[in-house]
Curated annotation (Swiss-Prot):
One of its GO terms (molecular function) is structural constituent of ribosome. One of its GO terms (cellular component) is ribonucleoprotein complex. This is Small ribosomal subunit protein uS11. Belongs to the universal ribosomal protein uS11 family. The gene is rpsK. Located on the platform of the 30S subunit, it bridges several disparate RNA helices of the 16S rRNA. Forms part of the Shine-Dalgarno cleft in the 70S ribosome.
């Protein structure tokens, strides 16, 4: 016969550690379908993250600039709670949420030091997929 699950003594809930990080990096991954914002410290340890799909936007609404704005506001507020005051922004991808996510972070009162486009560009590497015909 199977044992009954143990009570609360066996379950451990990890308390969120509040770091005090003044400077960070905001990684914005803007694809055509979604926008993911991750805010890290200088070493690359994630402090907070949010995505358009995680904020309740589904389907084609995920890929809108407004969805990216909402996601970056959520990630930015969580980073401010961790003590972040200055951010470098690294944008990757061609999606529609590129600019609106940076504007939303600036509107929260976070000082933006630098904006860099780190979209990977091939030096004629792999052959691209065939052209879509509708």
């Amino acid at each position: 016969m199977a044992k009954a699950p143990a009570s609360n003594a066996a379950q451990r809930v990890r308390k969120k550690v509040r770091k005090n990080v003044a400077d960070g990096i905001a990684h914005v991954h803007a694809s055509f379908n979604n926008t993911i914002i991750t805010i890290t410290d200088r070493q690359g340890n994630a402090l907070s993250w949010a995505s358009s799909g995680g904020q309740g936007f589904k389907g084609s609404r995920k890929s809108t600039p407004f969805a990216a704005q909402v996601a970056s506001e959520v990630a930015g507020r969580a980073a401010i709670e961790q003590g972040v005051k200055n951010l470098d922004v690294e944008i990757k991808g061609p999606g529609p949420g590129r600019e609106s996510s940076v504007r939303a972070l600036a509107a929260l009162g976070i000082r933006i030091n630098m904006i860099a486009d780190v979209t990977p560009v091939p030096h004629n590497g792999c052959r691209p997929q065939k052209r879509r015909r509708i």
